[in-house]
From Swiss-Prot:
SUPFAM superfamilies: Phosphoenolpyruvate/pyruvate domain, PK beta-barrel domain-like, PK C-terminal domain-like. It comes from the Eukaryota. Belongs to the pyruvate kinase family. This is Pyruvate kinase 2. It is an enzyme of class 2 (transferase). Keywords: Allosteric enzyme, ATP-binding, Glycolysis, Kinase, Magnesium, Metal-binding, Nucleotide-binding, Potassium, Pyruvate, Transferase. ATP binds at N52, F53, S54, H55, R91. Mg(2+) binds at E241, D265. It comes from Trypanosoma brucei brucei. Activated by fructose 2,6-bisphosphate, activated by the effector in a cooperative manner. It catalyses: pyruvate + ATP = phosphoenolpyruvate + ADP + H(+). Its cofactor is Mg(2+); K(+). Its EC number is 2.7.1.40.
Length: 499
C-alpha cells in the first residue's frame, strides 16, 4: 500500500494508538521548577527536562536538577535531564542612554572598536564580533535583536566599521543579539561560560547536552573534549541554528549523538519559508542513520498565555511527527507559561493522533533500502526483528541492552509498537527518552545478583508489558538479545506469546 492509499483510509472515528511513540522535552522554569509542578509535567507526558543555561545561575539549575530527580523518584520514572548551553553569541554593546529608537531610512554605523562598547548612539554602536567587516559584504544584511531590526550594509568605512541603512522601525536596548544571515561566522563552539556550565553538568551527572549554534563537526568534537573523561557517556545533541549548520549537516550528524532542529534562530539565519524544507531534510537524514532528532521552537507558543493551541500549531506538531521526529520540544510554554500541564497533554494527544497517519511499513522499507550492504551483524538482527514484528503484528518488542544501542537500532526501523528496553544502567534508561517508541525498564543486577540471567530480564520486560497494558495474554512479543556465547551485540530473535 502506498502512502497515498494509506492516507485515503485514515479516519477520525478510528481509535487512536494505545502508546505514544514520540517523546516530549519540556523546558523547566519558574512555572514548573517545584517538585509538585514537575510531578504534574511527568504525569502529563514529559520525557526529558531541559535546563536553559542562557538564563539562571548554577544554584538555580542545581535546584531544578534536585527537584526533577525527587519528582521522578516519587513517581518511579526515569526522566532525562538536558543541559542546553548558551553557546557563542554576537551581541551589541551598551548605549549611552540605555536605548535608541531607529526609523526606516536612518543611517547608522556599526563598529567593532572597543572604544564604543559602552557609549553607543543613534549614529554609531558597537558589535562584539571582531571579524564583522570581513564576514559581512557590502549589500549584505545584519539582523539585530533576533531579527526584529534589519540593517543593510551600504559601505565599509574602515577595517572596523560598516555604514548601514535601517530597514524598519525599532527601539534598540543594550546587549541585543546579532545574526549575520548567509555569512561564514568563525566563533568557538565552547565559550568560557559554556565551559564552566559543562563542568557543572558533568559534576551533576546530566544525561545530555543540547549544544547551541553548532556549525561544524569539529565544534561537536570541541564540546566532547570540554566534557572530558568524566563526561564521556553524556549524549551530545547538536542544535542546528544557522545556514552553516545546515550546510555541514551530514558531518555534524556523524559526530553527534543526536540533532535538534532549533527553528527559532534558524528562521532568522535562513529565510523563514525555507525552514520547513530544512526541517524535513534534517529529520530524514537522522532517520536514515538512526540518530534521534528533536523538533523545537514555537510549537505551541500561544499556550504560554492561552488554554488552547491554534489550529496552525496543532498542525505544526503533527507535521513534525509525520516528518519523522523522535521528540518534540516545549520552551516558554512550560518554563513560564500559564498552562504547563495542559500544553504537555495537548502535545501528547497530537502526537498520538499523528502516529495514525504515518505509514510504518513504507518508512521501514525506505530506511532499509537506503542502508549499505553488508550491514553490521547487530543491525541485521535488529532490522530483521522489526520485519518479524510487522509480519506477526506484534504488540511489543523487547530488547536487552545495557548501552541502549540495540534499542536505538530497533527504533531506527520504526516498528509500530512499543520497544521495551531492559537495561542494567540507569543512565541508559534516562538517555533513551529521546528515542522514538522506546520505554526503559531498569534491572538492578547488583540487587538481584543475577547479572547474566537473561531469562529473568526477559520475564521482567514481559511482566512490564502486561502491567502497562502494552500487550495482553496471548499477544505476540518479539524478543531480541544475545546468547551466552556472544558478547557485544544481539544474535537471537524470539517470538513469545505473552502468558
Amino acid at each position: 500500500m502506498s502512502q497515498l492509499e494509506h492516507n485515503i483510509g485514515l479516519s477520525i472515528f478510528e481509535p487512536v494508538a494505545k502508546h505514544r511513540a514520540n517523546r516530549i522535552v519540556c523546558t523547566i522554569g519558574p512555572s514548573t521548577q517545584s517538585v509538585e509542578a514537575l510531578k504534574n509535567l511527568m504525569k502529563s507526558g514529559m520525557s526529558v527536562a531541559r535546563m536553559n543555561f542562557s538564563h539562571g545561575s548554577h544554584e538555580y539549575h542545581q535546584t531544578t536538577i534536585n527537584n526533577v530527580r525527587a519528582a521522578a523518584a516519587e513517581l518511579g520514572l526515569h526522566i532525562g535531564i538536558a543541559l542546553d548551553t548558551k553557546g557563542p553569541e554576537i551581541r551589541t554593546g551598551l548605549f549611552k542612554d540605555g536605548e535608541v529608537t531607529f526609523a526606516p531610512g536612518d543611517i547608522v554605523c556599526v563598529t567593532t572598536d572597543p572604544a564604543y562598547e559602552k557609549v553607543g548612539t543613534k549614529e554609531k554602536f558597537y558589535i562584539d564580533y571582531p571579524q564583522l567587516t570581513k564576514a559581512v559584504p557590502v549589500g549584505g544584511s545584519i539582523y539585530v535583536d533576533d531579527g526584529v531590526m534589519t540593517l543593510r550594509v551600504l559601505s565599509k568605512e574602515d577595517d572596523r566599521t560598516l555604514k548601514c541603512h535601517v530597514n524598519n522601525h525599532h527601539r534598540l536596548t543594550d546587549r541585543r543579539g546579532i545574526n549575520l544571515p548567509g555569512c561564514e561566522v568563525d566563533l568557538p563552539a565552547v565559550s568560557e561560560k559554556d565551559r564552566k556550565d559543562l563542568e557543572f553538568g558533568v559534576a551533576q551527572g546530566v544525561d545530555m547536552i543540547f549544544a547551541s549554534f553548532i556549525r561544524t563537526a569539529e565544534q561537536v568534537r570541541e564540546v566532547r573534549a570540554a566534557l572530558g573523561e568524566k563526561g564521556k557517556d553524556i549524549l551530545i545533541i547538536s542544535k542546528i541554528e544557522n545556514h552553516q549548520g545546515v550546510q555541514n549537516i551530514d558531518s555534524i550528524i556523524e559526530a553527534s549523538n543526536g540533532i535538534m532542529v532549533a527553528r527559532g534562530d534558524l528562521g532568522v539565519e535562513i529565510p523563514a519559508e525555507k525552514v520547513c524544507v530544512a526541517q524535513m531534510c534534517i529529520i530524514s537524514k537522522c532517520n536514515v542513520v538512526g540518530k534521534p532528532v528533536i523538533c523545537a521552537t514555537q510549537m505551541l507558543e500561544s499556550m504560554t498565555s492561552n488554554p488552547r493551541p491554534t489550529r496552525a500549531e496543532v498542525s505544526d506538531v503533527a507535521n513534525a511527527v509525520l516528518n519523522g521526529a523522535d521528540c518534540v520540544m516545549l520552551s516558554g510554554e512550560t518554563a513560564k507559561g500559564k498552562y504547563p500541564n495542559e500544553v504537555v497533554q495537548y502535545m501528547a494527544r497530537i502526537c498520538v493522533e499523528a502516529q495514525s497517519a504515518t505509514h510504518d511499513t513504507v518508512m521501514f522499507n525506505s530506511i532499509k533500502n537506503l542502508q549499505k550492504i553488508p550491514m553490521c551483524p547487530e543491525e541485521a538482527v535488529c532490522s530483521s526483528a522489526v520485519a518479524s514484528a510487522f509480519e506477526v503484528q506484534a504488540k511489543a518488542m523487547l530488547v536487552l541492552s545495557n548501552t541502549g544501542r540495540s534499542a536505538r537500532l530497533i527504533s531506527k526501523y520504526r516498528p509500530n509498537c512499543p520497544i521495551i528496553c531492559v537495561t542494567t544502567r540507569l543512565q541508559t534508561c534516562r538517555q533513551l527518552n529521546v528515542t522514538r517508541s522506546v520505554v526503559s525498564v531498569f534491572y538492578d543486577a547488583a540487587k538481584s545478583g543475577e547479572d547474566k540471567d537473561k531469562e529473568k530480564r526477559v520475564k521482567l520486560g514481559l511482566d512490564f508489558a502486561k502491567k502497562e497494558k502494552y500487550a495482553s495474554t496471548g499477544d505476540v512479543v518479539v524478543v531480541v538479545h544475545a546468547d551466552h556465547s556472544v558478547k557485544g551485540y544481539p544474535n537471537q530473535t524470539r517470538l513469545i506469546y505473552l502468558p
